[in-house]
UniProtKB/Swiss-Prot annotation:
Residues 99-114, 143-161, 441-459 have a biased composition (Polar residues). SUPFAM superfamilies: Bet v1-like (SSF55961), GTPase activation domain, GAP (SSF48350). Residues 46-67, 82-161, 387-461, 467-486, 733-757 are annotated as: Disordered. The record marks 608 as: Arginine finger. Widely expressed with highest levels in kidney, lung and placenta. It is found in: Cell junction, Focal adhesion. Residues 387-397 have a biased composition (Low complexity). This is StAR-related lipid transfer protein 8. The modification Phosphoserine is found at residues 108, 235, 238, 498, 506. Residues 809-1017 form the START domain. The gene is STARD8. Its main location: other.
Amino acid sequence: MTLNNCASMKLEVHFQSKQNEDSEEEEQCTISSHWAFQQESKCWSPMGSSDLLAPPSPGLPATSSCESVLTELSATSLPVITVSLPPEPADLPLPGRAPSSSDRPLLSPTQGQEGPQDKAKKRHRNRSFLKHLESLRRKEKSGSQQAEPKHSPATSEKVSKASSFRSCRGFLSAGFYRAKNWAATSAGGSGANTRKAWEAWPVASFRHPQWTHRGDCLVHVPGDHKPGTFPRSLSIESLCPEDGHRLADWQPGRRWGCEGRRGSCGSTGSHASTYDNLPELYPAEPVMVGAEAEDEDDEESGGSYAHLDDILQHVWGLQQRVELWSRAMYPDLGPGDEEEEEATSSVEIATVEVKCQAEALSQMEVPAHGESPAWAQAEVQPAVLAPAQAPAEAEPVAQEEAEAPAPAPAPAPAQDSEQEAHSGGEPTFASSLSVEEGHSISDTVASSSELDSSGNSMNEAEAAGPLAGLQASMPRERRDSGVGASLTRPCRKLRWHSFQNSHRPSLNSESLEINRQFAGQINLLHKGSLLRLTAFMEKYTVPHKQGWVWSMPKFMRRNKTPDYRGQHVFGVPPLIHVQRTGQPLPQSIQQAMRYLRSQCLDQVGIFRKSGVKSRIQNLRQMNETSPDNVCYEGQSAYDVADLLKQYFRDLPEPIFTSKLTTTFLQIYQLLPKDQWLAAAQAATLLLPDENREVLQTLLYFLSDIASAEENQMTAGNLAVCLAPSIFHLNVSKKDSPSPRIKSKRSLIGRPGPRDLSDNMAATQGLSHMISDCKKLFQVPQDMVLQLCSSYSAAELSPPGPALAELRQAQAAGVSLSLYMEENIQDLLRDAAERFKGWMSVPGPQHTELACRKAPDGHPLRLWKASTEVAAPPAVVLHRVLRERALWDEDLLRAQVLEALMPGVELYHYVTDSMAPHPCRDFVVLRMWRSDLPRGGCLLVSQSLDPEQPVPESGVRALMLTSQYLMEPCGLGRSRLTHICRADLRGRSPDWYNKVFGHLCAMEVAKIRDSFPTLQAAGPETKL
């Protein structure tokens, strides 16, 4: 018995409870009218087996293959399979002749005469199938006698599921053939055989895995089906027309009479579950359930097939051209079919099926001879263009992630698909699904509308499809910088350019961004914001209540400085993180936010639904043990979201700081709604820079979550879920430095009036800040006008002369080194005096750190960091000068713009920042010397205005002075001293006093660690 791709199979499972222990022997059902049950032997015996296996009579319809062929294999009734076979190609209706009633079978029986080989094959298959059923019966009977008389529901369900899947596999794999047999038969095909095989395609096509489309079979499951259990009813229908028309008029993947519903899966040859919900690869649509739905579907199918003859009349005139086109496309089509080996596994069939779909798409791209008709072009073009466009769209994503080379354009989609599979993208299997299901291939990669001007992905499918996450879980390799060991050095810093580009400010508001203001301007804005906020509070605060007062700590109380040396992620304030790594958020927390933003935006109720405590605890331990190598692939979105909430809840103080948290709450409690934004802008400017950067990253991230309609989490919903964790509401800590006085709850446990008011204000405030996150981090324009003269005076300019002035001086015979000579002499003088007058402070990672005030009265200090390096001075100079990528993890790109003279050049480099904050761009004039006494070397640099504007990559920062001094200190060793003062924009002088010195010390430590440490092997010997 055969079941081809054009058949319709329906499985119905009826779960019945047993009446008693002997119900298995009492309730017996015949599987066919040709069988009888023998009570003595407890077996089924055929009644007139010769009649059963004989060919059907010409005058009667052959119904032996259409009746029920399964019986109860256990007390729980198993699926009843009903098979309808299409007519053989020999009896296809000719054009111009209407099919008679005799041509239409009652139950779609097999038509035509069968040869002796076909009869022998069918007998062998029928006997094998019946033997298989009897063996299952005996196994189950013996198992039931040994076990308890009454089976558990779980056991019955397992037996039912296993039996039904074995039956489905036997049916569905019977028509497939191995790829090697198909290749062998196709290699020896001729022109006549090609034509013969084309005409017999309706039967041959389903047997070759090349033409088996996953979308051509529909699997219908009940609407109340629970994934993981076998369904009550399972219906598999083909999309091929039931009429016996030639396949030239029907292409796999087209909908004929079955447009009303589509299954959520199409794999019928795999051991994997074919009814589980797979939303990522198979877009589900509403499934019609029940007998009424099936009747409606049958009526719709019949109506569609009734118009098929009219359509064929219009298409039949193009038949000759179609056959010419088919010969040109498939010159090696094999003439015959070979027997499939029974041992072919369903996994092999599914693999061959995916590969052959890619071959089919590549062959359908351009016909070699002849011109395809209009209807054929309409069907071929979507299948060809979409895979061809996929590599071009995935290329920016591959460049951004730097995990694999971007696929090069290729003439055939099959080659593109092969390259996509090697580069971490999804193979042609997903592409064919997208085309068949009515979605473009851009659903699995970043579409052109989701790419910004720089070519970076905006929605991070990052977005290369669900299967691309397998490669994302591997250790990330640093982007190739083309310099030495950087080709294989892993990057610990997160590159999240799509988050930066998606929140890039507009040209009108770019100059008002806080992160573009100089340090002196930020200092003025602090004073103006404090005055404005004081005016708001004095105007709207109730006079007799203590509202706008920052309580001072007790006079004799000593605040013990906490020790964070044993902590890495949780409970560590942003200031410690930025001193350690240069970024206020840990890398693992940024990875968690990126994972949620790129792959979990469609999770309904994210941040509202709770995760599993045990899994959250495991994630927390992973963050603490290896904060730079945490992979969230495959983790539940709700677990990762709860982990984020725990991080902000476990901070020593709220992200708004203990001093300003009450101020933020009072803004949304006392001020009118139209004053919220102005007051919140003033309060945000008063936050420490590291806290403000964390708050900006969090609010931009939450705005992206709220903008996704699929998760049903608006800004208000997110505020309700996150406000208690971010504001630290109703959390009292004995050792907390917070001056806020918590209101005590009543004895019955109810929250007090102040608690309710604080919760309401926090929810409204966080919702407002998420909605207006873009404006919240901009400088108020009226404040800039009020500070007009002083604000403009605080804007810095490059300390050195412009490049045009240097060229004029060089033309006049003045050496360019004279412009840097003062800088060099200051460095040599300080070194000769052993840096007298510098104030030492504790430095990280075995470095010496010191600072002093600038002689020009600028609020930014000079910082000095020094350490010993296991390399001679000349090698250290080359490492600093030409191999920055080896020690600067934040470096994005660097280039020498122009070599002005020996030892003097114009240098441009860009460093990254924590997303979504902009990158820092530097254009410096640098000069070096390697002829100092005792073999010492030095390098000095400072910013200048280039002659031609250099395209900015973010914010143009100012390097006021940068000096490197390499002094020999032993055999093969040197002492490296780095003196630096820079305005990175967007940071206050207080940030430079607390953070910038640590960043300089970390820089010299990375230069030191970039050289291998040589250790002597073996014990010391006395000479």
